Amino acid sequence: MALTYSSMLELGSKMPHFELKNVIDDKMYASTTLLNKKPSLIMVICNHCPYVIHYHEELKKINHDFGDNIDFVAISSNDIINYPQDGPKQMKKLFLDLGLSFPYLFDETQDIAKALKAECTPEFYLYDNKNMLVYRGRMDNSSPGNDIEISGNDLRSACTNLLNGSTISSNQHPSMGCNIKWK
């Protein structure tokens, strides 16, 4: 595992178009379903990264707290030939075991990860209801082994401010985690 930081996609960027399979129900899920409805949180994650695993419970809490007003979508873009634990069957099992209820999409071509300029897992991209990027970066400043309590403060603050119509600080911190496993 190589510790990698996110590249911080430019704020105001439009959400890239995607149409990917949701491994939970095997149906196609398109970004067009998110257009001009409510805000969206796209999370680039995977199954095996300790930095993603570190946030499983907090991710469930954030989804519980904001899921009625923000569409949550997780995407895994890792190479499954060399990392079979990140394959669709394992993705589905993980989400069902965790009790997560939002789509978990498989980006087999890695095109969406590239469009988002994703570098690591996890990365979080919060889009307003016009599909413009308003937050990108970390969930909080905790990480495996640093003894800082998981709070989700950075991501929670961005979600709260977006929903309240308040300004989201442009002073945002990159996420850090495992590098995306490119083909």
Language-model segments: residues:
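Chalcogenol-based redox active-site neighborhoods
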Residues: M1-N171, N179-K183
